[in-house]
């Protein structure tokens, strides 16, 4: 039996190093096996990158992270150029090692006590009116990092009284009650937790997560905060069927979720799960119609849609693709 890999605290493990730590092995995709991107997946980069550099500089100044950068989001240039960003708290090292995600895995450092104040000041300096806060998974913390979310919500509102806050939270596995108690007095304006894929694919796509647990987290939060909208998102192109996606949508509605995002999965590298299929825009349109028929009040469905992509517009019910 081989010895387990000893991870150093604070070291980021990515790509092949990260995948080597996953119990279910994912063989690197050969270049000839990679699906060619269709025309609708081509991104036009903005001509002016100054706004992008300004936002990156603001992040570096206060030692903050954006999921846009850490997860290699394809919409980074567009969102940064429009002056929006999704902040990632609790460091940039995740205790999980999902094979679809480009965020680094490892043993994270202790949470930075001053991060909530730094985050609030950065948001104030950027003059944001709507902000999305997410985090890595922190299975090493008693509350999964929930109190840190609550502290960030409190500090952001203290300095930015008119802002709207959306939190994209992890599943708080094994500590849901403690986490929800921590969020009780400082909830967000929108509570987002992604199911990511159909339950059949969880062992491959979300090792360490549980489909029913995630649904229960969404249900319990909504029960405690009936006036706060709950939201969830799914990736397409990982081998799921349309019928499976529709069943997930029904499960979400049965658990009180009213906001939805559906987007195309893109493999960050050949070491990650490969794209099984590029879903055409017409199919996203069809799923949006189904979602609205099921009772979702907001449904952003399209190849480039991500949880926080134009989240301010999503919250207003405007069409996002």
Swiss-Prot record:
Residues that, per the record, bind [4Fe-4S] cluster 2: 94, 98, 101
Binding site for [4Fe-4S] cluster 1: 68, 73, 79, 308
Enzyme class: transferase
Cofactor(s) needed: [4Fe-4S] cluster
SMART domains: Elp3
Catalytic function, reaction form: [[Fe-S] cluster scaffold protein carrying a second [4Fe-4S](2+) cluster] + N(6)-octanoyl-L-lysyl-[protein] + 2 oxidized [2Fe-2S]-[ferredoxin] + 2 S-adenosyl-L-methionine + 4 H(+) = [[Fe-S] cluster scaffold protein] + N(6)-[(R)-dihydrolipoyl]-L-lysyl-[protein] + 4 Fe(3+) + 2 hydrogen sulfide + 2 5'-deoxyadenosine + 2 L-methionine + 2 reduced [2Fe-2S]-[ferredoxin]
Cofactor: how and how many bound: Binds 2 [4Fe-4S] clusters per subunit. One cluster is coordinated with 3 cysteines and an exchangeable S-adenosyl-L-methionine.
Entry-linked SUPFAM superfamilies: Radical SAM enzymes
Chief localization: cytoplasm
Radical SAM core domain boundaries: 80-297
Record-level GO cellular component terms: cytoplasm
Any one GO molecular function term: lipoate synthase activity
Metabolic or biological pathway, per its Swiss-Prot or TrEMBL entry: Protein modification; protein lipoylation via endogenous pathway; protein N(6)-(lipoyl)lysine from octanoyl-[acyl-carrier-protein]: step 2/2
EC number: 2.8.1.8
Record's subcellular location: Cytoplasm
CDD domains the record matches: Radical_SAM
Domain of life: Bacteria
Keywords for this protein: 4Fe-4S, Cytoplasm, Iron, Iron-sulfur, Metal-binding, S-adenosyl-L-methionine, Transferase
Family designation: Belongs to the radical SAM superfamily. Lipoyl synthase family.
Protein name: Lipoyl synthase
Name of encoding gene: lipA
């Amino acid at each position: 039996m081989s010895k387990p890999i000893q991870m150093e605290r604070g070291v980021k493990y990515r790509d092949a190093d990260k995948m080597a730590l996953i119990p279910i092995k994912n063989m690197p995709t050969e270049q000839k096996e990679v699906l060619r991107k269709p025309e609708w997946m081509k991104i036009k980069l903005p001509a002016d990158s100054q706004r992008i550099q300004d936002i990156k500089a603001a992040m570096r100044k206060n030692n903050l992270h954006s999921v846009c950068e850490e997860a290699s989001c394809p919409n980074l240039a567009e969102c940064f150029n429009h002056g929006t960003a999704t902040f990632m708290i609790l460091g940039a090292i995740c205790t999980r090692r999902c094979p679809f995600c480009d965020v680094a895995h490892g043993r994270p450092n202790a949470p930075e006590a001053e991060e909530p104040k730094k985050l609030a000041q950065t948001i104030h300096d950027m003059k944001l009116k709507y902000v999305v806060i997410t985090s890595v998974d922190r299975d090493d913390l008693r509350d999964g990092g929930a109190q840190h979310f609550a502290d960030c919500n409190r500090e952001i509102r203290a300095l930015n009284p008119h802002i709207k806050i959306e939190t994209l939270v992890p599943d708080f596995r094994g500590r849901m009650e403690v986490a929800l108690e921590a969020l009780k007095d400082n909830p967000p304006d929108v509570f987002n937790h992604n199911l990511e894929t159909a339950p059949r694919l969880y062992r491959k796509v979300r090792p360490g997560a549980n489909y029913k647990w995630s649904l229960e987290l969404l249900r319990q939060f909504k029960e405690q905060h009936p006036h706060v909208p709950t939201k969830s998102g799914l990736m397409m192109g990982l081998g799921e069927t349309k019928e499976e996606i529709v069943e997930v949508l029904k499960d979400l509605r049965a658990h009180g979720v009213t906001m939805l995002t559906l987007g195309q999965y893109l493999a960050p590298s050949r070491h990650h799960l490969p794209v099984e299929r590029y879903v055409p825009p017409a199919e996203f349109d069809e799923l949006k119609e189904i979602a609205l028929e099921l009772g979702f009040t907001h449904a952003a469905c399209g190849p480039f849609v991500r949880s926080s992509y134009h989240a301010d517009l999503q919250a207003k019910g405007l069409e996002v693709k």
